[in-house]
Each structure stands twice: as structure tokens, then as C-alpha cells.
Amino acid sequence: MEIVYVYTRKRSEFGRQCNFSDRPAELHVDILPDPSQALNFIERNPCDVAIQCSHDMSEHEVNTERYDMEAHGINHVEGGWPKDINPQEMEQTIRFRKKVEKDDHYVTTISQLGSVMEHCIKQNNAINIYEEYFEETEELEGIDETPSANTVNVFRDPNEIKRTATHLSWHPDGNRKLAVAYSCLEFQRAPKDMNFESYIWDIEIPNKPELTLRPASPLVCLEYNPKDSHVLIGGCYNGQIAYWDTRKGGNPVESTVIEYSHRDPVYKVIWLQSKTGTECFSASTDGQILWWDIRKLSEPTEKLILDISKKENIDNALGAVSMEFEPTLPTKFMVGTEQGMIVSCNRKAKTPPEKIVCTYGGHHGPIYSIQRNPFFPKNFLTVGDWTARIWSEDCRESSIMWTKYHTSYLTDACWSPTRPTVFLTTKIDGTLDVWDYMYKQNNPSLSLKVSDEPLYNICMQDNGRFVACGSKMGVTTLMELSKGLYTLQRNERNLASAMFERETKREKILEARHREMRLKERSKAEPGEEVKDEKPAEDMKEIIANAEKDFFENIEAELKRKEQQEIKQSEDEHQEKEVSEEKIVHE
């Protein structure tokens, strides 16, 4: 900003006017050099010199305009029909064809064109141009390629108060959209003015969500209907179930009644393969599995309490954190619990207690993910604590394969839909690991630092090419894997089957060996001890009391030992002092 100040004065106060004129140069002083002064010159050594050695930097600011992107589509239908004929109506098209075939002009035109096309038709009938002559010598694709992944897009929570991206779901038709559920799962730490909205994103437009879903409570899980891509089902933090129809906007079409809903957050909701395509079931940490029909959400159609004692006691039920359902096995489903136990269930059992078939125990913490192998449904993948494990339905005591224990907690995992030996895991340090058991089993084939924030979930596209990861701050990262990680290799399915069968057989042998050792120990033990082994008399309270008793006894013994050492040490010091005094007196 320029500042101007005007000075005003009378002309008479300026003084006399200056008169300037040209004249030649004049020399006023000429000082000649003194040679005697040169003898007094002393060179300074060392000499301190200050210099500034740095890059020249300047600040630049650019205000760029943001491009608004829109999606446009064209609905192309079968052409060549009159306006009054609907190509979708079979009867109208058949009637029109018969009418045209009776026309004399049509017959002459077809006869003329037939002579031209006859030669080509005979060639097609004689030669199969699609025959593969070198089927067996087909080169393997992607084997020599180094595993890699590139970030395609990043979708950020548009709200000021960031929330965790708790669940991801791909659009079933074309996989061009991604539904993301946002919530805060930390108990009683949700911000006061936190937004409840979740979003549907177009993977090519990261600036603005395509549709905003407005539930009554934050969504913990969200799933597309595989039969109707316009319908989504969501599980809320307050235990309610709601469904949306994208053609009707972002408000839920209907929600369950709170009295008949879950009492805890709904961590998983899955669509069932039914004729109507309207049935689903949900799991929550309140220990209940509820079946629903979205045509009538007033109350659940079925209920299962996850009480492994089969007494249907809700107080003893195991909290469900993850759940799995394979459409090829319509009567079976599996549940991962907070206690690190896997519960295998049969939906078509006659009574609720019979629905719990068996349990698998192998994790030290909650099982955040459970998924069957898409190629071998008998094998399933689980993630809990610091490791990922691969199980077989035939081995209940232990898993057949597992990863090493990581330094960071694992949060989610999923199988590759195109390769039977590839699965992906996410960790709380923001790392995405891609495991390829076909080539390496000790370490991941690719470990990628996606974010500085914890990654909480992962979801792969149906073709295995793209994978999306959700973080704690609501950032969803879309990545493209290298071709070798999603291209099925030659003979890979047979090799994977042999590997799973080999590991299953090994675990069965170990289980049989352990069983024999336990029987031998029981046979050597006394009858009273044998009964004790079969039916332990001590309950959990007695075990805790005995442990506390042993602990305090050890503490008291240690204190007594230290006290005796101090007494002995003081006695030795006293004796040494007396000896030294006697020596002094003697001297």
C-alpha cells in the first residue's frame, strides 16, 4: 500500500535558486604512495571470513481452479425397429419379422445377398478360426514380473471431524462404485458433533461422493445386494438394521425397531442367496445372530444365540465381530468372536442349540476377519492378534498354515478372487501385505506402506485387479495390483490343492500323536488322577485363588531371604569392625 504525504511551503522560503553550469575536471588532492608504509604490512593468518552458502529459495503461491467432473452415459438399445415396435417385447418383434418376411422385396433382397455371402458361410463351416493349436505350451503370465501396486485414487471423508472407514463394499455390476461406511468404534470417544453420513463413491471421481447415505446412527457395515445393485443393507452403531434404495435418495427406506434389534454395534451383515433377494442376516457383539427380510423389518425371522454350551443363555454368549457366508454352501456359516474362537454353524438345524456345530480356537484376541477360500471352500482364512491363519474344516484343534507373528496388530484380510494362494492383510501401522503362498510362505511377497494411519479394512474387486483400504481417519485408498498378483498361473489350482491337503494331513497326524500321548499319560496315572484329568474339580475361582496364594507365598519367601541376607551382612560388618578395633588397640 502506497503512502503519500504532501509538503507545502512558500516559494520565498525555499532559498535562492540553484544555477548549475558545465566546467572541466579539477584535481583537489593528490596523495602519493609511501614506500615505507609497505614495510609495516602484515598478512593476517588465519583470517576469519564469513560466507553464506545456501540455496536461493523463494516462496511461490498458485491458486488453481478445481475441475468439476461429471459422469455421462448413453443408453444404447437395439436399433433398426420402427418407433411403434418395442424391441423388448418378444411378441411384437416376432409379429414384425413375419410381416417383413412376407414382403416380395425382402425375398429378392435376401436371395441376392445370399449368393454373395455363401462363400464366406462355407468357409466358416469348414474352418474353426478360434481353434488353439498350442494349448499345452501356453506361457505363464506374470511370473517374472516383480510384485507391485500403484495408488489409483484416494477418497477422503469430506467432514471436518474425521471418522474411521469401517467397511467397504464394491458395486456388483461393473465394480465402478464403492460404498464406504464411516463410524467411530472407540467406546465413548465419539466427538460431540460427529456426522452420521456414509457415502457411495465413483472410483473415477474422488472429489465428491456420488450419493450420501443418511442413517439414524453411524454405519459400521454396509453391503450391496448382489441381485439388485440399487439396494444396500447397513448395520448401525446402535444395533439397528437399515436398507437403502439408491433410486429413492439417501434416506433409508426402512429400519428395524430398536426393541427387536441388536443391543451392540452390528459388525457384519450379509445377503442370503434367496429367490426373492430380500433376505439377510446380521451379527453383533451382543452374542446374537438375527435373520431379516427387508420387506418386513419389524422383527427378525430367526434368531441364534452364540452360547457354545447350547443353553441359549444370552449372558454367556460370545460376541460376534466377523462373519462368513459362502453361497455355494447355503446351510453353513462361520462366526469370528471377540474371545478368539471360531464358531461353525448350520442354519438348517431343527433347534437353535443344534445350529452350533463346532468351534475352532486359535487366536489370542478378537477375530476381525474370516473368509473362505473362493477355490477351496473347506479352507478358510482368519485374522486376529498378530497373525493370519489358514484353517481346514477337518482340523479343529489347530490351523494348518499361519503367518509369522508381526510387531503390529493385524486388522483385516481377504482372499484374492482370482488366485487360490494369494491373500492380503492390513496392519495397524498402515501397511498392506500381499502374501503369495505359491512362491513364498515366510514373508509377504509385497509389503506396501499405504498410510501413516492404521488401516482397518480391505476389500478386493471381483477381478482381483483393484483393492481398496480404509484407514482410521476416513481415507480410502484405491490401488491397482501388478498383473502377476491377480493372473491365475498354469497348474496353480492343482498345486494349491496339493499344498492344502498336505498341510491338513500333517496336522491330522500331529493331532493323532497328541491324542495318543494324552491316553498314555492317563493310563499311567492313578484312577483318582484320571478322573481328575477327565473332569477337573477346580473351577476358575479356585484356580485364581491358588495362583494368588502361590504368588504371595513366593513374595513372602523372597522377603524373608532378603531379610536374612541383610542380617548376615550386618553381622559380618560388625565382626570386621571389632577385628579392626582390636588391631588398633594392640598396636
Swiss-Prot record:
The alphabetized UniProt keywords are: Cell projection, Cilium, Cilium biogenesis/degradation, Cytoplasm, Cytoskeleton, Dynein, Microtubule, Motor protein, Repeat, WD repeat
Q: Where is this region: Disordered?
A: 519-542, 562-587
* GO term, biological process aspect, one: outer dynein arm assembly
Q: Self-association or partners: how does it assemble?
A: Consists of at least two heavy chains and a number of intermediate and light chains. Interacts with DNAAF2. Interacts with DNAAF6/PIH1D3. Interacts with HEATR2; probably involved in outer arm dynein assembly. Interacts with C16ORF71/DAAP1.
* GO CC annotation: dynein axonemal particle; microtubule; outer dynein arm
Which parts of the chain are WD repeats? 214-254, 261-302, 362-401, 405-445
Q: Where is the protein localized?
A: Cytoplasm, Cytoskeleton, Cilium axoneme; Dynein axonemal particle
Q: In the UniProt record, what gene is named as encoding this protein?
A: dnai2
Family to which the UniProt record says this protein belongs: Belongs to the dynein intermediate chain family.
* SUPFAM superfamilies xrefs: WD40 repeat-like (SSF50978)
Q: What is the lineage of its organism?
A: Eukaryota, Metazoa, Chordata, Craniata, Vertebrata
Q: Any idea what job this protein has?
A: Part of the dynein complex of multiciliated cell cilia.
Q: Which InterPro entries match?
A: Dynein_IC (IPR050687), WD40/YVTN_repeat-like_dom_sf (IPR015943), WD40_repeat_dom_sf (IPR036322), WD40_rpt (IPR001680)
Source superkingdom? Eukaryota
Q: Name one Pfam family in it.
A: WD40
Annotated Gene Ontology MF terms? dynein heavy chain binding; dynein light chain binding
UniProt organism field? Xenopus laevis (African clawed frog)
What protein does this entry describe? Answer: Dynein axonemal intermediate chain 2
